[in-house]
């Protein structure tokens, strides 16, 4: 797991869903692992990969294959995501559509609707009163400068926690 200590509570005012949209775009390539090659390599070296954004954090989960080279490759890819992510405008519309579908699926569940209404009643339409996934009008208003600024501000070693568990050589990983 790589956990960034930033979530939807850090979304700029009027830009709800920015942290979640960035999470989606963070699978689309870096300076050294271009475009969809990033996701292809994640798929090659993991049994499963996923991500989520909540109010306080953004998490990237990788269940790494048991081959010795797999862990090193995933650590490399996560370091690329942390320091060399390339955000591309061409992916934004399709990722907004995915976020929109995720929101529809979530809001199709009665408990989620209840929680959303309770949080809105308690906090209004800001901070904890809005879902981390954001609202469509706000998502559509997010621009590349805002995404890049959020990334540069929050995706950094001093704002991340990496958790590695399983059978591996601790000394080798730390080197």
Model-assigned labels for residue ranges:
Residues 23-27:
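Active-site-flanking alpha-helical
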Residues 111, 144, 148-175:
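Non-catalytic, conformational "gating/processing" segments within enzyme and secreted inhibitor domains
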Residues 29-32, 63-96, 174:
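M16/insulysin-pitrilysin zinc metalloprotease superfamily fold
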Residues 39, 86-104, 169:
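Acidic/histidine-enriched alpha-helical segments
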Residues 43-47, 141-149:
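Short amphipathic beta-strand starts and helix->beta connectors
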Residues 98-117:
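Short acidic/His-enriched helical or mixed secondary-structure segments at domain edges of catalytic enzymes
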Residues 1-21, 36-80, 111-137, 159-165:
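M16 family metallopeptidases and their MPP-like homologs
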Residues 85, 104, 108, 137-140, ...:
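Hydrophobic alpha-helical scaffolding
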């Amino acid at each position: 797991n790589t956990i960034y200590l930033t979530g939807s509570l850090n979304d700029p005012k009027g830009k709800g869903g920015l942290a979640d949209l960035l999470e989606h775009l963070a699978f689309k390539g870096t300076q050294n692992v271009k475009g969809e090659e990033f996701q292809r390599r994640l798929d090659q070296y993991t049994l499963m990969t996923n991500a989520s954004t909540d109010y306080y954090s953004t998490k990237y989960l990788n269940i790494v294959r048991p081959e010795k080279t797999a862990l090193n490759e995933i650590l490399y890819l996560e370091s690329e995501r942390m320091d060399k992510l390339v955000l591309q405008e061409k992916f934004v519309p399709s990722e907004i559509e995915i976020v929109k579908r995720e929101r529809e699926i979530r809001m199709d569940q009665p408990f989620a609707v209840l929680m959303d209404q309770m949080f809105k009643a308690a906090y209004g339409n800001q901070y904890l009163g809005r879902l981390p996934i954001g609202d469509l009008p706000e998502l559509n208003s997010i621009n590349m400068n805002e995404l890049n600024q959020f990334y540069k501000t929050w995706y950094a070693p001093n704002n991340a926690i990496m958790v590695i568990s399983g059978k591996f050589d601790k000394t080798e990983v730390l080197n």
